[in-house]
Each structure stands twice: as structure tokens, then as C-alpha cells.
């Protein structure tokens, strides 16, 4: 999980979703997991 000021899709399978007001990237590749905050 990377915590970044701006989250971006890294590959076509990445999805940006909002959970409890936090932007997250979920992906099949665990190295692509990110969250904003």
C-alpha cells in the first residue's frame, strides 16, 4: 500500500474507488494498491 498525495491508475486493471471519503486504487497486482491521505 502506497500513501500518496495523488493516486493514479498504473495499469488497465487498476480501479479508483472512494471509501469513507478516502480515494483508493485497487488492482489485481498488490504492488499497485494506493491510497490518498
UniProtKB/Swiss-Prot annotation:
Keywords: Ribonucleoprotein, Ribosomal protein. PROSITE patterns: RIBOSOMAL_L36. It holds the Pfam family Ribosomal_L36. It comes from the Bacteria. One of its GO terms (biological process) is translation. One of its GO terms (cellular component) is ribonucleoprotein complex. One of its GO terms (molecular function) is structural constituent of ribosome. PANTHER family: 50S RIBOSOMAL PROTEIN L36, CHLOROPLASTIC, LARGE RIBOSOMAL SUBUNIT PROTEIN BL36C. NCBIfam families: rpmJ_bact. Belongs to the bacterial ribosomal protein bL36 family. This is Large ribosomal subunit protein bL36. It comes from Maridesulfovibrio salexigens (strain ATCC 14822 / DSM 2638 / NCIMB 8403 / VKM B-1763). The gene is rpmJ.
Amino acid at each position: 500500500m502506497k500513501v500518496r498525495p495523488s493516486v493514479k491508475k498504473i495499469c488497465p486493471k487498476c480501479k479508483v474507488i472512494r471509501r469513507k471519503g478516502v480515494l483508493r486504487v485497487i488492482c489485481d497486482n498488490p504492488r499497485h494498491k494506493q491510497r490518498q491521505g
